[in-house]
Structure formats: C-alpha cells, structure tokens
Amino acid sequence: MADRPAIQLIDEEKEFHQSALQYFQQCIGNRDVGLDYHVISVFGSQSSGKSTLLNVLFNTNFDTMDAQVKRQQTTKGIWLAHTKQVNTTIEIDNDRPDIFVLDVEGSDGSERGEDQDFERKAALFAIAVSEVLIVNMWEQQIGLYQGNNMALLKTVFEVNLSLFGKNDNDHKVLLLFVIRDHVGVTPLSSLSDSVTRELEKIWTELSKPAGCEGSSLYDYFDLKFVGLAHKLLQEDKFTQDVKKLGDSFVMKGTENYYFKPQYHHRLPLDGWTMYAENCWDQIERNKDLDLPTQQILVARFKTEEISNEALEEFISKYDESIAPLKGNLGSLTSQLVKLKEECLTKYDEQASRYARNVYMEKREALNTKLNSHISGTINEFLESLMEKLWDDLKLEVSSRDKATTSFVESVAAGKSKIEKEFNESMETFKKLGLLISNEEITCKFSDDIEERIKQLRDAELKAKIGRIKKNLVPELKDHVIHLLSHPSKKVWDDIMNDFESTIKDNISAYQVEKDKYDFKIGLSESENAKIYKNIRILAWRTLDTTVHDYLKIDTIVSILRDRFEDVFRYDAEGSPRLWKTEEEIDGAFRVAKEHALEVFEVLSLAVTSDNVEIIPDVPMAEEESGEDNEIYRDNEGVFHSRRFAHILTELQKENVLDQFRRQINITVLDSKRSIITTRTHIPPWIYVLLAVLGWNEFVAVIRNPLFVTLTLILGATFFVIHKFGLWGPVVNVVQSAVGETRTAIKDKLRQFVVEDHEVKESFEMKDFSKNEQKEK
Amino acid sequence: MADRPAIQLIDEEKEFHQSALQYFQQCIGNRDVGLDYHVISVFGSQSSGKSTLLNVLFNTNFDTMDAQVKRQQTTKGIWLAHTKQVNTTIEIDNDRPDIFVLDVEGSDGSERGEDQDFERKAALFAIAVSEVLIVNMWEQQIGLYQGNNMALLKTVFEVNLSLFGKNDNDHKVLLLFVIRDHVGVTPLSSLSDSVTRELEKIWTELSKPAGCEGSSLYDYFDLKFVGLAHKLLQEDKFTQDVKKLGDSFVMKGTENYYFKPQYHHRLPLDGWTMYAENCWDQIERNKDLDLPTQQILVARFKTEEISNEALEEFISKYDESIAPLKGNLGSLTSQLVKLKEECLTKYDEQASRYARNVYMEKREALNTKLNSHISGTINEFLESLMEKLWDDLKLEVSSRDKATTSFVESVAAGKSKIEKEFNESMETFKKLGLLISNEEITCKFSDDIEERIKQLRDAELKAKIGRIKKNLVPELKDHVIHLLSHPSKKVWDDIMNDFESTIKDNISAYQVEKDKYDFKIGLSESENAKIYKNIRILAWRTLDTTVHDYLKIDTIVSILRDRFEDVFRYDAEGSPRLWKTEEEIDGAFRVAKEHALEVFEVLSLAVTSDNVEIIPDVPMAEEESGEDNEIYRDNEGVFHSRRFAHILTELQKENVLDQFRRQINITVLDSKRSIITTRTHIPPWIYVLLAVLGWNEFVAVIRNPLFVTLTLILGATFFVIHKFGLWGPVVNVVQSAVGETRTAIKDKLRQFVVEDHEVKESFEMKDFSKNEQKEK
Ligand SMILES: Nc1nc2c(ncn2[C@@H]2O[C@H](COP(=O)(O)OP(=O)(O)O)[C@@H](O)[C@H]2O)c(=O)[nH]1
Ligand SMILES: Nc1nc2c(ncn2[C@@H]2O[C@H](COP(=O)(O)OP(=O)(O)O)[C@@H](O)[C@H]2O)c(=O)[nH]1
Ligand SMILES: [Mg+2]
Ligand SMILES: [Mg+2]
C-alpha cells in the first residue's frame, strides 16, 4: 500500500510549497538516499486517466474522477507522492529505489477555459524536474492538434529551450507516450510514427534561441511509446499492460529500462528540492508564458481591424459632406455629430462582440482619432469665426463716433463680443462631445485675440504718434530756426522753454498730470510713460538735427554780421546813422562788435543763462555697437563731439571770428570812406568865390616882389620835399616846431595839423590792434 | 444500398460546387419533392467517427479512416450525399423523405494545425443550412475546452448571430449531441448536463449584436443527447444504439422525432441550393472569421512586449552614456552603434522564436524607433558641428587678408570646408547604419548654411553700405550747401553733376560697367542693381532733405542780398566803390538787383539750364497708404507740393522778394546818404580863408548903402520863402526864368541849381519806382 498521502507541491495559485523537503524526510526517514531516487511526472488532457494510471502503476493515492457522477476536473495544481512499490508482472522483492511521482493538473480543462497559463507552466516544470515525463493521451486524440495538446507542447518546447536550452548538465528527458484505450486496430507502431512525425515537425518550426539553431529534438528528449487497453471494457488486458509498463521502471540493465543515467539530474534529494523551487521561480517569472487568452488576442486583432475600417469610411465621407457646411455652426455640428455617431456605431456593431475591455480601449482610441480629425475642422471653423468677428471689430472701431466713444471702449466692447460668440460656439461643440479639452483652444484664442488687439492698438498708437510727429517736427524746426536766427544771450533758455511748450502743446490732449500722459489706447502706465519718452526722444533728435544743421559757419557769421550792422548802422531810435567824425565810427564799431560777439558764445555752446550746459534728458543716439558715441570723424578727417551742446569746434570758432572780422572791417572802411569824402570835398563854386574875393589880394602879391619871392621859394621847397618823399622829416620838423611853439599858433593851424594826424593814427591803430588781437 | 456516391459540395479551397443542383436532380429524378426533404450535417473532431456514423445510420458511402493503417484525416471539405434509407430498429417500408446528408471535415486536425479558418466556416455553414446538426464527440472529450471544440463553437455562435441572428424565418436548429464510446459508467444525463451547462455559459459570454442582447440559446437551438457504445469493443450494442438513433429520424409524430417543422427552411430544394450557396458566400466574406492563427496573434503580442522592453532599456542607458561623448564623432558613433546593437540583440534573443514575419516587422519598427531616437543625438551633434564650423568660417572671413582675398572667395572656401566635414560626419553615421535617410538632413543643412551665409552676406553688405552712407551723406550735404550758398544760373546743373559724381566716387570701387555695379558680396546682377538703386534712393533723399531744409526764406534772402552787395559795393576789379553821383548809385543798384534776382528763380524751382524740371530717377517717398503724396499741409495750414523741384510756394516767393527789397533799399539809402554828406560838407578853414580874403570886399559893401539895402532885401525874401515853405514855387519861377534866360547865366549858377534839383528828383524817383514795382 501507499506510504503516505500525496502532498500539493504547487497549489492552484501557483505557489511552491516548501513543505516538500519535510515530506521527503518523512518518506525516507534517516536513510541516506544519495542519488538513488527518481522523479516521474505526467502530462495530458484533463480526465484522461492520468491519476488512475499513476495509482495503478505506482500504488500512489492521487485523487481520481468518479465517472459515475460526472466528468470534471479533479487534480488541481501539482501533487507529489512518494513510492517504492511499482506494479510489475513479477514480484521482485529487492532493494527498490525511491520514486517521487508528480501528478500534474490536466490540460485543456473547461473550468479554466481559455486561460492556458498554468498548463504551460506546469508542463514546463514537469519537463524541467523529471527524468521521465509520461505523456498521457487517448488513442483517439492522435491526429488532433489542440485536442492532443500539440500547440501546448510547442510553446513548452520553445520556452524550455530559452530557459534551459544552454544548460551544461546535458539533462535529457524521456518522453513516455502512454496511449490509453488502445484497442489494437491501429498498430502501436503506426500511432508512434504519427506522434513522432508530429513532434519532429513541431520542433523544426520552433523559434530556437541563439546557439540552439542546429539542435535536434533528440538532443533533449528520448521518445518511448506504450499502449494500454481500455480500462473499462478490457479490464484484464489493461491490468496486464500496466504491469508490463511497470517492469520498465524496475528492471535495471534491461534494454527497456526507463531510468537511464542520462535522465538523472545528479543532485542529492535536498538539492533537487532547491532546484525544483528555482525552476518554478524561473518559470513563474518567464514572460514568454504570460500570454493573454486567445479571446483577448483575437479581440485586439479584430477590434483594430474594425476600427481602422470605420475610420477609413469616416474619412472618405468626411470631406465632401463637411466642405459645404464650413460656415454654418448648426448644420456643421449636426453633420459632425452624425458622422461621428455613424462611425462609432459601425465600430460598435462589429467590435462589441469581442472582449469588453479590449473593445472599450479601442473605442476610446477611435474616439480620440475622430475628435482629432474633427478638431481640425473645428479649429478651421473657429479661425474663420475669429476672422469674421475680428473684421467686425475692426470695422466697429474704425467707424466709431470718435467724439463719444473712445478707442479703448470700442475695443473692449468688440473683444467682449468676440469672446462671447467664440465661447458660445465652443460650448456648442463641447456639449455635443465633439470637443474634449477646450483649455488649449481657449488659451490659443486668448493669445490670438490679445495679439490682434495689440496690433490694432499698435496701429492706432502709430497713427496718433504719426500725427503728433507730423506737427511737432516742423513746428520745432521753425521755432528753433527763428530763435537762432535772431539770438539773444539767453537764446537757449528761450529755446528750451519753447521746446517744452511745443511738446506740451502737441500732446496736451493726452496729459493726465504733470509729466504723466495717457494716450487713450488702453496701455499701462509704464507703456504710456515709454511712449512719452519716445516722443521726447524724437523731439530732442529733431532739436539736435535742426541746431547742428542750421548753425554752420556761414550761418553763424551771417547772424553775427546782422547783429553788428543793426547796432552799427542805426542809432538807438532805429534811424540810419550819418557819420560826422571818425571817433563816432570807432565808438559805434566797438559797441556793435561787442553786441554781436555777445551771442557768439551761445551760438557755439548751448548753455542756459545760468551757464549750465544743455544735456538732453533722454538718450538720443542709436547705439552703434563697438563705437564711441562721444567722438566721431567726418569725411574731412575732423573729429567732432557728438554732445548736443557742442556746436562749434575751436577751429570752427576761429574760422567764424575771422570771417566776421573781415566783413565788419569792410563795413567800417566803407563808413570811414564816406567820412573822408565828406571831409575833403570842396564844391567848385567855392573856388570861383575864392578867386573873385581874392583877386585884389592876388594882384597885390604879384606887384610886391617880396611876396613873389617868398611864394617861389615856398613852392620850390614844397616841390623838392614832395619829389623826394621828404614829407616825413618835414612833418617831424614841423611837428617839433609846432610842439614847441603851438601854444602861440592860431587855432586854424593847430586844427589843420591835428585833424590830419588823427586820420593817420586811426589807420595805424587799426592795424596795430588787429595784430595785437591775433597775438592774443 | 446507397443510391449514388457522395459529391463534394465545397472543396478544400473553399469553392462551392454548383454541380449540387444537378446531383439533386439525379437523386430525385422527375419526382416532385416539394418541401418533403431534410438536411442533416455533422460536426466534430477529426477521426471521431463522424463518417462512420453517417454511413451506418443513413447508409451513405462517405470515406472513413482505415484505422489498421494509421490515424489521419480522410474527409476534406464538405461532402453531400442523398439517402432515403435510414437504419432503424424495425423495418418500415413506407414513403420515406429524401434526406441530404453533409459530412463536414473534422475540426482540430493536425494537418491544418493552427489554421482554424475552414473549421469555423464549415461549422457555420452546417448550422446555417441544416435542420439537424449532429455534434459528434467522444465521451472523454466532455470536460475539455479546446479538445471538445468549445472555443470553436463559441466563435461560430457569435458569427452566426451577427450574420443570421436577425433572420425573419425563425429558423431553429436541432443540435444532436452524439456521444461516442459511451461505456455507461457516467450516466448520459450527467454528460448532457455538463455539455448543456458549458453551452449556456458560452452563450452568456457571447458578444451579441444589437437587437440580440436578451436572446437565449434556446431561441435558436434545441439540444438532444444520444450515447453510442464502443464500436469496436461493444459492437452489438453500438449497432443497436445506432438503430435506435435512426428511429428518431423516421418515426413521425413520436415525441423523439427529430425533423420537427420548426427546423425546416421551408424552401423548395432548388431554393435551398441557392440559399446554401448564398450562405457560403456570406460566410466566406465575413471578416470576423478571418483571424490569424494563434501563433501569429501570440507573436504580435509578445514581440510588441519584447520590443517595448528593449526600447525602454535602451532609453534608460542612453542619456548617461551618450552625454559625455557628444562632441567626439568616433566615440559617439561607436557608443551609438553599441547601444543600438545591444538593444536589437536583446530583442532578437527573445523575439526571434516567434513567427518570422511578425518578428521581422516589429524589428523594423524597433529599428525605426531607435534611429528616430538616435537621430535626435545625431542632429544635435551635427548642429554643434555646424555651429563650430560656422564660427570657424566667420573667424576666417573676418580675419582674412582683405587685400588678397575677397569676401566671396573666403565664404566659398569656408562653405566648401563646412560641407566637406558635414558630409564626412554624415557618411560616418550612414555607413554605420545609424542614419537611414540623409536627404532631409542634407536639405535642412543646405537651407541652414544658405540662411547663415545670407546673414553673413547681409552683415557684410550692411557694413559696406554703412561705410558708403557715412561718407556719401555728409559729402553730398556739404557740396550741395556750398553750391546753393553761392548760386549761379546753372546751379542745378552743377548740383546734378556733383550729385552724380559724388555717388560715382563713393561706389567707384564696385563699378563694373556704366550703371552696373558688383558689391563683391556674391549677389546676383539684379540684387546688385537693387542695392545700387537703394544707394541712389538714399542719395536723392539726402539731396531732397538738404535742399529743402537749407533753402528757407531767410537763407534765400541772405543769398540774394550777398549777391546784390557783391556787385553793388565793389566794382569790376573788386575794389570798394566810392560814390560820386546819384546816377552812379542808381545804375549800380539796377545792375546789382538784376544780378541778384537772376538766381531767385533757380532758388525757388529746381530746373536745369535747359529749363527742365529736375525729377528724381528713383522713388523717394515712403508710400503712406491712403494719402496723396503730391500735396501736404503743414502745421500752419499751408499746402505744399512734395515734388522735389518745388522749393518755394508763390506766397513764399512774395515773402522773399519783400524782404530782399527792404534790405537792398536800406543799402541804397546808406549809399545815397554818403553822397549827400560828401557833396555839401565844407571844411572850417575855408570859411576862415573866405573871411580873410573877403574882408576888404565886405567892408566895401558895408560902406556902400546900395549893397547893404540889396543884401537886406534878399535876406528878408529868403527868410519869408523858407518860413512859409515856398521854395517849390520859387524854384518853379527860377527854373522858368532860367529856362528863358539860362543861356545867358554863367556856368556857376546853372551848375548850382541843377545839382540841387537832381538830388530831389532821385528821391522822388526811388519812391515812384518802388510803388511801380509793387503794382507790377
Ligand atoms: N476509458 C478509460 N477510462 C479510464 C482509464 N483510466 C481511467 N479512466 C477513468 O477516467 C476517469 C478519470 O480518470 P483520472 O485518473 O481522474 O483522470 P486524470 O484527470 O487524467 O487524472 C475516471 O473515472 C477513470 O475511472 C482508461 O484507461 N480508459
Ligand atoms: N472507438 C471507436 N471508433 C470508431 C467509432 N466509429 C468509428 N470508429 C473508427 O474511427 C475511425 C475514424 O472514423 P471516421 O468515420 O473516418 O471518422 P471521421 O473522420 O470523424 O469521419 C475509423 O477507423 C473507425 O473505424 C466508434 O464509435 N468508436
Ligand atoms: Mg488526475
Ligand atoms: Mg469523416
């Protein structure tokens, strides 16, 4: 009888029971088994008599099906039994080895249905840990594919190769095919040929891992075939067949002995236990055995196919039916919903029969694709709507009553209207399930409308600034040129006052506070401040250009000359002057020159009346990279300062003064010439009068020889002095004499000599002062 | 015995044989069968004794397996036989109906292996066309899932529902389960319960189409169970069981009669033939039955899983191992190849065991993903390389010897070098299989390098134009202002000549032909022409601004005045004039005024010496939309013409002439005043001399009372006339008297009177001419 009841090595939850080691120890007691043990397992369809066979053959006590009740699964998991008693034809009472028998749960049970996971792992485990694997099959199963577990064996062979194919222990397994209910009509040789051929075919078709490509079935397995008679209808023969089978498990040395050394794992028993547990772990972790059921695999394949077809039909219908409706929200949405519903319905009709989770997963994916496709049209519609609403807004803003409605108000109203209509359209799409996420669209729309409003605002601002510029620039130019062409000492104070007031006047409509402006565009305080600053920059640039273009050397000389002549030619009341004496001319010259040069300094350096250099309060220069903006060189090689206040260089100042002096000297010369011609011109009738009045005196002189002699002597002396240019010494002598005796000479002589002397001194003094000024 | 041999209705290639109609006619001859016929088919695993049963039961002659040879498939396709002879327990020799029997190819044959396509279609067809479907199964198959064709039945039930579920003919099928080799240990009731429960479970799990959700198994099928004893080991009982089965096919009216009216299709025989053919077409076309084999489905699932894992591992390793190598082509490529090979090897090891085409397909997809991921790094590398090479090119271009190497040459050399290194790098990647298509990268690279060269070219061009501008603008300004400040009648000819020559001088380095320039940047002829045109536009704008800013009213008045004074104040030799008479002044005045006004016309309208208006040869104005560029309104409301040649308006011309006249009149007045003072001034010593010389005459007059009396009378008369302003009439009288007696008066008197008269006339004439000119 059996030693002990069988234990469950691996339960239905695929847990390895470590009590096996304890069981082994109970079975073998204190005996040293060493390597003298064997492991046998069984594999086959459910209720194919596996347990019955093992019990009859090895006197084990595995549960078997009670056929009188019904056909159903009995063995669950993998059970382990120990035996030393094998049913044989003759009783051999010698030292029998310990045999450990694994009864494996039957494959293809209707209880597990499509879930083949445990079957594969159990079969794999049986092959891995056994020396002999009994493959149990009904005679009638031979020739079937699924029914004879050939598909299962193929998978098991493949995984076995990848997991254990390269093992170094040259472990081989005996596959013992036991053919049940073999009635004998078909010879066993024919059946074994069929099975062998099938196995070899499977092996050829296997996907073998690297290094096992050339391997053969027989590198890993030996095949044996045994037939057993019908247990119920041929009971005696069945018993006899089983005993004959039993002989091959105990008859060492004989040809048919099954436990050949090459099948043994060569592990001590406790080593085998660890090995078995390790095998189960590896098998459990192997993902190649983690396959979805046939149902799920088919469902994935079919739902994918159906989904693609439905989408294809949707797309083919889409364009032609949507094209004419692109502008109409109502008909567009209804058509979109219709097309989408049709597509999903078509999918549902065909795909709903497949596994629900797979069907729903693919439906979600299809829904996403449909929405993605639809979103293109929705985006187009929303963009068209946006364009239309935007045109409305632009028209409304441009045609508003500018007196009663501000730009900001009309833009805000238009924006509000756009947002309302846009959101309504989007809600329509969303309510109908055509739009999933509207955050992205809303965000893009908001960015778009902000961008467009910014453009509109920029255009309005540009127009306003353009108008300001169009007035400000010429006005500034005119005012500055007018002030500079008639300058005073405080011309720059005037220019600055006018500069500020001109700016103020041109943007007075936008002033909110002192130095705070709102350009009525809806900009922030800082943006308005920046625009104000830009306007000031423009104004300063205009001032700079105007000043530096106007105040050239020629212009400044002209200004100085005008100023000089105003004072020199006209008296305080504005009447033209008539010169009587040179002293008048010299005095007027000095005053006029001083009056002109008063403004020369302000025309060459822009300073206020407090002698403070004028510096722009905003940056004017465009930053030219790598260039010093303080100094630049013109095309004549002259270096200039770019500072606003610096109008003339020292060299240019010299140039101006030279030209000015030259011109006013000419004026003075003209004036002095007018005196000379006034002074020495004696009308012709005077000579007549003198002749008439002096006739009697003249006659008296002629009659008197003394007078004649004196006249001749004086004439001759006069002639000689003049001829030989001796007036200088004569003048000196006369002057000396005059200096000594002038107090006694009459007013006439003194007056005559002094007047001539003043003219000469004036000329010399002018030359001398000119040299003196140059030296300074 | 059997009437005729069976025919093949549907062959192994799934072709429907239309000879069936002919066969029917042969079987029934000229008899009118009407609806008195029945159709039976059989379904079950291969070699399960289906054909044997049909032959025994209906005396047909279907081929059966010869068990003594080997177990293998015999029936291929679907065969049709006709019988009227049913094997029954008692011989009933009455009018038997015609029975058409379909022998269907067995399912799960190892010959077809995993290909279940025909099995499904055959089973579906059998259900569709039969009244009774015999489901043949071994007793031992009960409890198995695949082994008992339950999976197959499930698929068939599903497709049957979708294809024929909504048929209006209320067609029902009797499923007659014949359990073979029923040894009787398990009661038939138990077996039928097991099968029924299994079928009901399958039906519940079915995915039913719309409209069939609430349907029951029994809406479409009736179930019957029959057990047959072991044919070989219980031969007599088997025969008896078959006869009992046969009774149920012929015993009308009995409870167990199988051919109930609700199973009949109610079609005449030829109608049934068309129906059968139509059914087969529908079944053939149904895609739900077109499933890949389990092998392929598993392969798809597993290779996807393996591929994703391999890719995941590749990506996790990728970043940290690539990051330090991004700059080195050699080590980068070797590491990329290594990582890619590792990934593909890992995939190959696990996935190569699965169906080859699926494995290769997924491998290609994985390869594409790997390359896509790698291409990111390659793009980064190539972009970095591009940046580095580009910096080299920029350095080389900027530091070239500008005397010996042109911009175009150095750019071309640099570009060639970049392309060479870039292509070498790309070839390296391509040769190692890391890059599939390099057209896109090459195209993007070419676009990039063209864009960068364009930027470099633009910068170089901008620099060149900047230098041209920096010289051209001030030079033009100076020249124009110089010419305009000292204008001649042909000033505009001079300005135009100088304008063209200044432009020419500044771009002479780039001239190729007359009016053709190459700016040595590598631009096309049209691009060079455009740049030349832009330079001319700039020059014209400068000319326009300079002219219109300079030629203001004040400046033109100043120019005219200078020109007047040059002629009026200085004689032909350049000496200052000293006026002797008013006639001289008037003559000089006329000449000088005419000389000044010569240039007034050219200063207000820019025309050449041929009196042709100067029009710019390039468009200067920036097009301000919606604005007429011919006329603009300044800030004083005055309308201006924007045409270049129009310098002064009519109003401004009047203004200039007024100011000019006022100024030159002052000058003339000064000059005339200088004459007056010259004419009438008598030095004081003359009076002394006159007194001295005329003392004796004076005394003589005093002593003579007549002279005294005359003197008093003349003095009194003189006083009265002066007091009452009667010089006019006195002058008239004197003139009249002189006119009558002047021939007798001495030169002195005539000279005195005439000179005084000329001065007065000069004054009156000036006023009169002034009024006259104003009226003109
Ligand atoms: N026809 C037949 N039935 C058998 C044979 N061996 C066992 N059975 C019966 O088949 C049923 C199932 O046997 P069992 O050993 O539990 O099958 P297991 O599920 O493969 O272990 C039991 O009712 C046995 O009596 C046999 O060789 N031939
Ligand atoms: N054990 C057994 N064998 C049978 C039975 N009926 C037929 N066979 C044998 O099974 C083999 C196959 O029979 P066949 O009718 O060709 O099977 P089919 O492929 O289903 O048509 C033949 O050798 C028959 O002799 C039966 O009821 N029991
Ligand atoms: Mg069992
Ligand atoms: Mg057959």
Curated annotation (Swiss-Prot), chains A, B:
Gene3D superfamilies: P-loop containing nucleotide triphosphate hydrolases
Induction conditions: By salt stress.
Enzyme class: hydrolase
Record key words, sorted: Endoplasmic reticulum, GTP-binding, Hydrolase, Membrane, Nucleotide-binding, Stress response, Transmembrane, Transmembrane helix
UniProt-annotated location(s): Endoplasmic reticulum membrane
Membrane-traversing stretches: 682-702, 706-726
Stored Pfam families: RHD3_GTPase, Sey1_3HB
UniProt superkingdom: Eukaryota
EC nos: 3.6.5.-
BP term (GO), one: endoplasmic reticulum inheritance
GO molecular function: GTP binding; GTPase activity
Topology in membrane: Multi-pass membrane protein
CDD domains per the UniProt record, alphabetical: GBP
Topology feature Lumenal, residues: 703-705
One GO cellular component, as annotated: endoplasmic reticulum membrane
Binding-site list for GTP: G44, S45, Q46, S47, S48, G49, K50, S51
Cytoplasmic membrane side: 1-681, 727-776
Record's miscellaneous remark: Present with 2265 molecules/cell in log phase SD medium.
Subunit composition and interactions: Interacts with RTN1 and YOP1; GTP binding is not required for these interactions.
Family designation: Belongs to the TRAFAC class dynamin-like GTPase superfamily. GB1/RHD3 GTPase family. RHD3 subfamily.
Cited function: Cooperates with the reticulon proteins RTN1 and RTN2 and the tubule-shaping DP1 family protein YOP1 to generate and maintain the structure of the tubular endoplasmic reticulum network. Has GTPase activity, which is required for its function in ER organization.
This protein's name: Protein SEY1
Organism: Saccharomyces cerevisiae (strain ATCC 204508 / S288c) (Baker's yeast)
Gene: SEY1
